[in-house]
Amino acid sequence: KNTPAGAVSVVSAGPTSAFEAAIKGVYSFDLKGPEVSGHISGPISETLGARLAVKFVDQDGYIENLANGRDEPQNRSALARLTLRYAPTDTFDYNLKVEYADKEVKGGLNVSSPLTTPQQPKTTRFSTQNPIGPEGTKVTSWLVSGTGNYQMGDFTLTSITGYSFFRSNIVNNFDQAVPAGGTTRNSVYNSYPEHFRQWSQEVRLLSPTGRKFEYIVGAYYDTALYRLTQLGGFDINIPGVLVYQGLLNTEFRQRSESFSVFGQGTLNFTEDLRAIGSLRYTQTDKRGHFFGRLRSGPFALRPVNARANGKLSEDNIDPSITLQYDFTPQVMAYATFGRGSKSGGFVSNTYGTTDASFRYRPEESENIEAGIKSTLADGKLVLNVSVYDTSFKDLQVSVYNSALQVYQTGNAASASSKGVEGSAAWYPMDNLSFTLAAAYQDAKYDDYPGAACLASQPITTCNPANPASAAANNIAGSPLPYTSKFSYSLQARHRFDLGEDNVIDTTIGLSGRSKYFDSDNQSPLFGRQKGYSKLDARVQYGPVDERWHVAVVGKNLTNEKTTGSAFNLPFPITAAPRAIMYLEETRNISIEAGMRF
């Protein structure tokens, strides 16, 4: 709530007042398959409009599984979105959106690498069938939302009703290829069936605009049910050390309710100076239930015969205040302070969870930011820059503990992120443009007592085999995982006219980031992704009115092999200790064609 750490807003297109349709097809030479999308939109009657959009994907993956000869992960997905807009009068309209998605991914995207060297991700893996199901992911989801707007004079009353549902199952294997050569046994595998549904309702009132004081007030409510099953299988055969076959199981159930009231006001002191303030009060209630058991096997390899029950009731008040000043109509400066919060919760999939370790605390953040937004040189140059300082209290973290082979969810006492962000766009002529976005940040733990041992810590500082040593560990000053000091995105676009009717549109983009830890134990070897840059390009040909087009598209043309996360798969869970890392998409070249009606 009031999230200074960032939020994502996705707005899809609505029905149009005139008929239109489009279709686009993409064939990937590297993923060996097509992607087809299209939409049709227009009025059904004078008061009702509709838009239907669909997308289908049938592509192979970018990693060869040497066990079955398949390129993984294979992606088969279908998505459909229907949007209806009903406007019987000038003062009322209602928008209904229904979205359905079905996705099946066959195979995995993790590969093995040595524990004692920097990351060496390959584009091959070896993964055999496990007893609990084929490796991959299946997801089915429904999203339904209805938004009604009623004009009451100069005021607007808005109602938003939402329903969300998904069920999924993820089955994980881990690459059995031994980095030194050969393969090893499929000794550990797991599955995570999930089920979620939520109802929500929001009502808000928007005041007239263009006045000295403008405001929005509203209320929000949601209720949700979440269920998670965990199956952990083992097939270990290390003679003289450990011979074990078993299946462990945990079950988690949670019901939650959330209610909030909020308001935001803008006070226009002058045409150039304004203050924007907001305040949100939130009440959250949750009930959670957890239990574990041994489904099969001679004994529990981990402490699974545990139960936990808990409930929480929390309330938060999250304010923000922003001052904006227009030096000119093209240059605006601002400064803002905001407080955000995230409700606490329950550990859902850690073996051996008890009442004492079941609950984690809510997270709070404070953010100070200042910046300038400007449009200069008669619109040919756009410059924006901002600086920020964000602090987190009880930062919620989920860390993989390789000594226990479990993910542990809890709170870091405090953390902070400071940085500067900037963007620029330059339009030197009508058919040429350049854009640049860059950011520098310093994100670290300020205080984290009881943290899992880091790979860089000597055993005299933190010994994972000694509970007292691990409990006394504090990794204050260590960087937050998955955060780079520097990141950037650069793009150049040129439009070349071929006579009066046709054009060639060329776009080249370069994006990258500096090194970062992508393993929870922050190994300076297998757990650190080095800095990289990825080159993308697109060349499109078609008429000026864009009725149709053909294009060649290249992504990651430098073929950088980067990883999203990594962890240590240790002995004796496997006879061949190795790093497991998740390989991001490699080079992909495709051809695209589209037509508009």
Task: Label each residue range with its predicted role.
Residues L510-N521, Y541-F597:
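C-terminal beta-signal and adjacent terminal beta-strands/loops
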Residues R85-T89, L205-P208, Y220-D222, F252-T390:
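Structural signature of Gram-negative outer-membrane beta-barrels, strongest in the C-terminal barrel
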Residues V26-E35, V57-T89, T124-W142, T184-S200, ...:
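Outer-membrane beta-barrel proteins
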Residues E214-I216, A275, D389-S391, G410-D520, ...:
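Gram-negative outer-membrane beta-barrel transporters
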Residues G69, Q74-I216, D222-A224, V382-L383:
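Outer-membrane beta-barrel domain signature, strongest for Gram-negative TonB-dependent receptors
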Residues K1-N65, R70-A80, T91-F92, W142, ...:
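Outer-membrane beta-barrel translocator/receptor signature
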Residues S145-F174, D326-K342, R359-Y427, S433-A439, ...:
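Membrane-embedded beta-barrel scaffold of Gram-negative outer-membrane proteins
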Residues I63-D71, G108-I132, N173-S191, L231-E251, ...:
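Solvent-exposed loop segments that connect transmembrane elements
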